[in-house]
Every structure is written in C-alpha cells, then in structure tokens.
Amino acid sequence: MPPKIRELISMLESAGFENTGGKGSHRNFKHSQSSTLVTVSGQLGDDAKHYLIKAVKIALENSRNENN
C-alpha cells in the first residue's frame, strides 16, 4: 500500500524541508540549508502517486548530498 501524502510531508519536514506555500492542494517545500525544492500535490489523506514518491526520495537524497 502506498504511503499517504501526510506521511511524505512528515518525511520532508523531519529532513529539514519547510513549507513555502502553494495553491489549492499543491504545497511547495524547500530545504532550509540547500537549494532543493519539491512540490507535493494531493489531499493529506490521499495515497501518494508513484511519481510523487520518487520525487520526494530524490529531493531527500539531493538535500543529503548538498549538506555533505
């Protein structure tokens, strides 16, 4: 079962990403110490789409690499 949007947002926030706004069901997250950006779309209780899961994983990896 895919993770919920709420879980992806929690992962981003625990990794140092901050919500920089958005419109409607779209939320933009920027890492506080790097230039990594990711947009999360969907309602909090929705299942995350495969492409969104991949985008979040890439953003988390990029933020780790830029901080090292």
Model region roles, listed by residue range:
Residues 1-21, 30-68:
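Basic nucleic-acid-binding interfaces
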